[in-house]
C-alpha cells in the first residue's frame, strides 16, 4: 500500500479549491470513502475489496486528523470540526462492521496489531505477578499466568501470548502452547481453587502446538486432563476469547462458567484453511469454509456456546486498546459478580449443564 492512498490525492486537489484548505479537504476525503462504500453496499463492487480499501483510507485519514489536531491546539473551532470528522469515521467503521463476512472477521481476529492477553492484563489487572513452570518439564512462554487484582478482588489470570515481532513470536512459539503450557495452566487453576480465587482466562490461540516433541510429551493427555479438571473447578471461572479461539488449544483453557467473545473474535473446531483443504481439497475456499463453520462471535452466541458478545471500538480492537480493555473489564465485572453469589455446587452443576447442552446431533435409523 502506498504511503498516500488514492483518495488522498483527490482530497489534496479539493484542498486547493477550498477557502480554508485542509479541513474541507479532509471532509471531502471522508465523503469520498463513504461514497465508495455505499457503492459496495449496492453490490456494484466486491465488498471484501472495498472494505480493505476503505479501511486503508480511513487509517490514513485518522493519522492526518491527529496531526491536524496538534497543529490546531489553540483553535477551538478547528478542533471541534476535526472531532466531528473523527465521529464520521467511527460511524462509517461501524457501518462496515455490520456487514463484515465471517472471513473478514477472521482477518480482524488475526490482525497483527490486535491487543494480546498481556495488553489486556496491563490495562485491567494491576499488580499482576506471573508464575512460571509446570513443575514437571519446563516453562512455556506461549502460555502466561499469575495472580492479580481486579476491582478489589484477587484473581488468577491465564492467557496465551503470540508475540509482536519475529524474536517474540519465536520465543512465544507463535502463541501455540506445548503440553507443559497446559499443565502450567492447570497448576495455576488448582492453585486458585485452593485459595478460593476466581479464574479468568484470555484466549487468543490458533491451536495447540502439533510438533513431534509436544506429541511425545503428551499433548492430547494434557488437554484432556484440563477439560476434566476445569469441569469440576470449585471457583468462579470466566473465559474471554479475545482473538482466535482455535480448536482444542483454546478449549483447554476455556471450559468456564461464562464464555465471552470479543465482537471480532472467532471460535472454531478447526482453522478455516484446514477446513477448506479437507472439505473442498482447496485452501482458497476459506471464505466459504468460514461461513459454514459458524465461527464468529454472533454465531457462537446464537448457538449457545458463547454467553456474551463484547463490543469493540469502531474498526476493531486494534484501533483503541484502552477502549477494548475497558469493555472486557466491564463484562468481567458483571459476570464475576453474578458467579460469586452462587453456591459451589450450583456453580458446578450449571457449568456441567452448559457444556452438555452445547452439542446437536441427528440420529439416523436405517
Identify what each model region corresponds to:
Residues 49, 203-333, 337, 341:
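Conserved catalytic cores of soluble enzyme domains
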Residues 106-109, 170-172, 315-318:
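Short hinge/gating elements
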Residues 61, 101, 157, 204, ...:
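Terminal peptide-recognition signature
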Residues 98, 123, 127, 137-139, ...:
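Glycine-rich beta-alpha loop segments
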Residues 3, 10, 15-16, 23, ...:
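Short, low-complexity intrinsically disordered segments enriched in A/P/G/S/L with frequent Arg
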Residues 56, 112-119, 139, 143, ...:
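Charged, alpha-helix-enriched surfaces in structured cytosolic catalytic cores
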Residues 1, 29, 33-37, 43-154, ...:
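Intrinsically disordered, low-complexity segments enriched in small/flexible residues
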Amino acid at each position: 500500500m502506498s504511503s498516500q492512498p488514492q483518495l488522498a490525492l483527490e482530497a489534496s486537489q479539493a484542498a486547493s479549491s477550498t477557502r480554508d484548505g485542509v479541513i474541507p479537504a479532509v471532509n471531502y476525503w471522508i465523503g469520498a470513502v463513504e461514497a465508495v462504500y455505499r457503492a459496495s453496499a449496492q453490490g456494484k463492487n466486491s465488498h471484501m475489496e472495498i472494505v480493505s480499501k476503505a479501511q486503508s483510507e480511513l487509517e490514513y485519514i485518522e493519522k492526518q486528523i491527529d496531526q491536524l489536531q496538534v497543529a490546531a491546539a489553540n483553535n477551538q473551532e478547528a478542533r471541534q470540526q476535526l472531532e466531528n470528522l473523527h465521529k464520521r469515521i467511527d460511524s462509517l467503521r461501524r457501518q462496515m462492521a455490520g456487514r463484515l463476512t465471517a472471513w473478514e472477521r477472521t482477518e480482524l481476529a488475526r490482525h497483527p496489531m490486535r491487543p494480546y492477553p498481556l495488553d489486556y492484563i496491563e490495562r485491567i489487572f494491576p499488580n499482576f505477578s506471573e508464575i512460571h513452570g509446570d513443575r514437571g518439564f519446563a516453562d512455556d512462554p506461549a502460555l502466561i499466568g499469575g495472580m492479580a487484582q481486579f476491582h478489589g478482588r484477587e484473581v488468577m489470570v491465564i492467557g496465551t501470548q503470540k508475540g509482536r515481532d519475529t524474536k517474540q513470536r519465536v520465543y512465544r512459539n507463535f502463541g501455540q502452547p506445548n503440553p507443559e503450557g497446559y499443565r502450567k495452566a492447570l497448576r495455576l487453576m488448582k492453585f486458585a481453587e485452593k485459595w478460593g480465587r476466581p479464574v479468568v482466562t484470555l484466549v487468543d490461540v490458533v491451536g495447540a502446538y502439533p510438533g513431534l516433541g509436544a506429541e511425545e510429551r503428551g499433548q492430547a493427555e494434557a488437554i484432556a486432563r484440563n477439560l476434566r479438571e476445569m469441569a469440576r473447578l470449585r471457583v468462579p471461572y470466566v473465559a474471554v476469547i479475545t482473538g482466535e479461539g482455535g480448536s482444542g488449544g483454546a478449549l483447554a483453557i476455556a471450559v468456564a462458567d461464562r464464555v465471552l467473545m470479543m465482537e471480532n473474535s472467532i471460535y472454531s473446531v478447526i482453522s478455516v484453511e484446514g477446513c477448506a483443504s479437507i472439505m473442498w481439497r482447496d485452501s482458497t475456499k476459506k471464505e466459504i469454509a468460514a461461513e459454514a463453520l459458524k465461527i464468529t462471535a454472533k454465531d457462537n452466541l446464537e448457538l449457545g456456546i458463547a454467553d456474551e458478545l463484547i463490543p469493540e471500538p469502531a474498526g476493531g480492537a486494534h484501533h483503541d486498546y484502552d477502549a477494548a480493555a475497558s469493555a472486557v473489564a466491564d463484562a468481567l465485572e458483571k459476570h464475576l459478580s453474578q458467579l460469586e453469589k452462587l453456591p459451589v455446587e450450583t456453580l458446578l452443576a450449571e457449568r456441567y449443564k452448559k457444556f452438555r447442552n452445547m452439542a446437536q446431533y441427528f440420529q439416523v435409523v436405517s
